[in-house]
Amino acid sequence: MPKKAIISGVYNTKVGEVPGSTAMSLHAEAARGAIADAGLKLADVDGVLCAYVITETYPMLSSAFCEYVGIQPNFNAGVNAGGATGAIMVMQAAAMVEAGICKHV
């Protein structure tokens, strides 16, 4: 039976200027919030996709993010597709789940 991908958790951070926050800390907050909303633990996540940011430089953002939050995924990648980045990331996550590469992205 083919696997069907779903969005099981969501979370929104504050937007705009958020004193005391970095792009990485906001990425981490969003990830932890979405993981909790899905009823999962960090250890359940086996795939990671990160959107690049223009305010801070991380040559390997997705790998740096995984280290920052303590995730050891089977797959991780940074995505930069301009205004389509969010949609592309959802499509990539669904493809990885449906192909059986990952369970939780």
Regions found by a protein language model. Name each.
Residues 81-105:
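Active-site-proximal alpha-helical scaffold in enzymes
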